[in-house]
Swiss-Prot record:
Gene Ontology biological process terms in this record: flavonoid biosynthetic process; polyketide biosynthetic process
EC top class, as a word: transferase
PANTHER family found in the cross-reference section: CHALCONE SYNTHASE, HYDROXYMETHYLGLUTARYL-COA SYNTHASE
Protein name per its UniProtKB record: Chalcone synthase
A GO MF term: naringenin-chalcone synthase activity
Family, similarity comment: Belongs to the thiolase-like superfamily. Chalcone/stilbene synthases family.
Amino acid sequence: MASIEEIRQAPRADGPATILAIGTATPPNAIYQADYPDYYFRVTKSEHMTELKEKFRRMCDKSMIKKRYMYLTEEILKENPNLCEYMGSSLDTRQDMVVSEVPRLGKEAAVKAIKEWGQPKSKITHVIMCTTSGVDMPGADYQLTKLLGLRPSVRRFMLYQQGCFAGGTVLRLAKDLAENNKDARVLVVCSEITAICFRGPTEAALDSMVGQALFGDGAGALIVGSDPDLSIERPLFQMAWAGQTLLPDSDGAIDGHLREVGLTFHLLKDVPGIISKNITNALEDAFSPIGVSDWNNLFWIAHPGGPAILDQVEAKLGLKEEKLAATRNVLSDFGNMSSACVLFILDEMRKKSLRDGATTTGEGLDWGVLFGFGPSLTVETVVLHSVPLNC
């Protein structure tokens, strides 16, 4: 019989956790930002609020978003008018939607990642599922496992209600699992549906309207493992380090509360300032062991939040305009998809690097940073290392 010491000596991986495949998915319903103020005030029966509509139009114009995707269509909203009220009793209606749609959209992204990976799904050993869109038991991790037909013995982790920083959280967890379990292959899925937080406008809560102007639906999926078999697996990025921190003096900066009216968001105006004020410390903690101090020598994958956050971070660090190009492209094409955003940006980064003829998956650079920002304020930082591209 094995001793506890022998069990503890189970083999661990030799190399760093590596992203081996990426998949993304959105609902088919595209919403164009230029048309959204008219649409939003019409479907919520708020067209009489003319001054508020003009404020909302300015929010949309400043968002730097061209297009978003949403599960909610005009037909669905007509059938469920309680979603269109500002504080309508609606949690059951919202839950009925997201409990099925979150894993379904997650499956679409996962299928693409598994196809790119090219290995049998029976080799998946762990599943990390993440969403801020509703909550249920058994969870979306269970539903995803059933939808994909994964092994009953797959080890599952479910993250609910973490918010926008969680795209970094799932990478940190996947890193620990891959590096501490030899031959582990971790399926990571972030799936977000705004049906949980869509609501009509009110002058009394402009921060709620900011969310209505920014958020979109999407799901991202990764396959993560250490010591890839280079004859059948294609590394995209390695994860060298991952950490989480709470920013000082940020209590109440971003809050979300799940209530009978759905998920409500509240944010302070100085969120961009709080993040930009503290980002240098986060970077120094992560990169001083590597010897990187020029932040323009990194490739950047930053949760977009909104354009004000990106602008202030860019100014604070003296970043060249092109450093946040991948992040801004995703914000423009998809909006803020909460936890899924950074997975879309990873996908954009490796594809853009290939299109541009770069020598690595990180725009020709070796080292990069992935940032997730979210409630409390919490910051997730992941140090990435690119891999060579055979252009």
